[in-house]
Amino acid sequence: MMSEIKTNLLDLDRDAMRAFFVELGEKPFRADQIMKWIYHFGCDDFDQMNNVNKVLRERLKAIAEIRAPEVSREQRSSDGTIKWALQVGGQEVETVYIPEEDRATLCVSSQVGCALACKFCSTAQQGFNRNLKVSEIIGQVWRAAKIVGGKRPITNVVMMGMGEPLLNLANVIPAMRLMMDDFGYGISKRRVTISTSGVVPALDILGDQIDVALAISLHAPNDKLRSEIMPINDKYNIEDFLAGVRRYLAKSNANGGRVTVEYVLLDHINDDMQHAHELAKVLKDTPSKINLIPFNPFPGNPYGKPSNSRIDRFSKVLMEYGFTVIVRKTRGDDIDAACGQLVGEVIDRTKRTMKNRMQQDGISVKMV
């Protein structure tokens, strides 16, 4: 006889958790109690919850569990960055912890692999398998907080790990609610950031359901170049994307009225001075601060990192237009934890890895 599948309480945001306990015949406040144990104390053992009566504890042990992804590998960088490979149903996703003097940021994955095939991203070359569940997203935060320890182990969360978060809103939104909930991690909405490559319809849905900080992966100042390095641009071009961003900003209080624009600098591809002028002009109607990200190379990729002088010139052009510009300091590159380097272990349903390998070997995909 098969045992009944237990409910993983990490899959439930506060509303769902309260509904779960009401269905058990309990008062809604029980949900708040349990959430505090899970998220404030990092507890995954019902027996340790000493303000919950024994009858309820025994019942919970029979029908529920608190199960976060387990760490399969840990790497520590010389700069303090930590990268974990976490097991999610026979595959792996990567999560990165970035400590600084005044904050501690966790970079969280939303999918196993990624469906979008951006040319400069290591994750994209692995193809795509599936969306992560709520428990597998908030579970990354839970696991990291438990390992790091301390009173406020994580102050900021960025949904910038593996995957396109807006293609998994059904799970990403409840997970972000838990990050911000006072009975969860209590992180300010200004310190929870979602990043997107431009899934415009989902951006409109996001703005109707939750308010968090927004970052956009732009990476090119015109449609021709952007389509070459980011195929999603063929579906949602720059004009449509930025219009969607402005609609989101009109609904949001978490962004201070402007979006963070991420722009990876690829040597002699998108980093010429004309590109900087183009970028300033294309963003003139969209209040922005710009993060310039020098490319982080990975094996098998044709792109290079620009020289410091090219990066500096590009940055100065944008500042002359009045933009706030930050050149992102590369963190964790000695353990492949920098932007665009996350890989994990993906069973590729899109067969992208195989196609890329065949093309490199001069084999036609159509022949196969």
From Swiss-Prot:
Reaction proceeds by a ping-pong mechanism involving intermediate methylation of a conserved cysteine residue. Its cofactor is [4Fe-4S] cluster. It comes from Aeromonas salmonicida (strain A449). The keyword Lyase does not apply. PANTHER family: 23S RRNA METHYLTRANSFERASE (PTHR30544), RADICAL SAM CORE DOMAIN-CONTAINING PROTEIN (PTHR30544:SF5). The gene is rlmN. [4Fe-4S] cluster binds at C114, C118, C121. It is found in: Cytoplasm. The active site is at E94 (proton acceptor), C339 (s-methylcysteine intermediate). One of its GO terms (molecular function) is rRNA binding. Belongs to the radical SAM superfamily. RlmN family. Binds 1 [4Fe-4S] cluster. The cluster is coordinated with 3 cysteines and an exchangeable S-adenosyl-L-methionine. It is an enzyme of class 2 (transferase). S-adenosyl-L-methionine binds at G163, E164, S195, S217, L218, H219, N296. This is Dual-specificity RNA methyltransferase RlmN. Signal peptide: none annotated.
